[in-house]
């Protein structure tokens, strides 16, 4: 019988959430623990990629986290981002988030009218054939988006500015769950690194997303 569940994500900030209802309705215990966390690369590490952010006229951002680390890196490298820089974002929320860092003007920030597909930005990109694009990424990423741009005649330079790191499991905390829910491939990696000798036994594992499923299959 499933009585104790672990979700590899932060505890919800509000009391009314699906997990509370799960506990109330079925009498189970829901625990939360972030198996991974994000660390920004230091400027000296980033320089090893031999990329100068000021050589580009546009930045491609696929998350608020990417925006934070782009401006953080520029600050650490003592670079002044020019007011003429263009920003291509995969969603409106990321685009509007830039107000935290720049004097926001619609003519220099682009995002899809709906959804979060970079493909919807291709017309705007093709109108600026001389643009030079830098794409901010994590160390864990796929090349799908970069390949999509290349297939449409747009050259993009990937720049790794932050990385996903395993969060150590507390030594005094038991790991005795009936079900473990993993949400990312990095979570699978963290589980293996934290418990290299762990045997699944009767423990159920829930995986969210095709990438996480593949990571579990590869992990055996």
Regions found by a protein language model. Give the residues of each.
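Conserved beta-alpha
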Residues: 1-220
């Amino acid at each position: 019988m499933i009585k104790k569940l672990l979700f590899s994500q932060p505890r919800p900030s509000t009391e009314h959430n699906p997990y509370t209802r799960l506990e109330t309705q079925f009498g189970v215990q829901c625990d939360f623990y972030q198996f991974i966390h994000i660390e920004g690369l230091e400027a000296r590490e980033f320089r090893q990629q031999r990329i100068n952010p000021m050589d580009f006229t546009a930045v491609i951002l696929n998350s608020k986290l990417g925006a934070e680390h782009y401006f953080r890196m520029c600050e650490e490298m003592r670079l002044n981002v020019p007011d003429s820089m263009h920003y291509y974002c995969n969603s409106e929320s990321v685009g509007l988030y830039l107000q935290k860092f720049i004097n926001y003007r619609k003519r220099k920030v682009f995002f899809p009218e709906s959804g979060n597909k970079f493909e919807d930005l291709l017309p705007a990109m093709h109108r600026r054939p001389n643009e030079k694009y830098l794409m901010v990424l994590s160390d864990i990423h796929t090349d799908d988006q970069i390949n999509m741009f290349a297939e449409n005649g747009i050259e993009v330079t990937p720049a790794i500015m932050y990385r996903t790191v395993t969060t150590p499991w507390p030594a005094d905390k038991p790991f005795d769950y009936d079900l473990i829910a993993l949400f990312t491939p990095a979570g699978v990696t963290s589980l293996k690194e934290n418990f290299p000798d762990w045997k699944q036994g009767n423990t159920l594992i829930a995986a969210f997303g095709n990438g996480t499923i593949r990571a579990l299959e590869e992990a055996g």
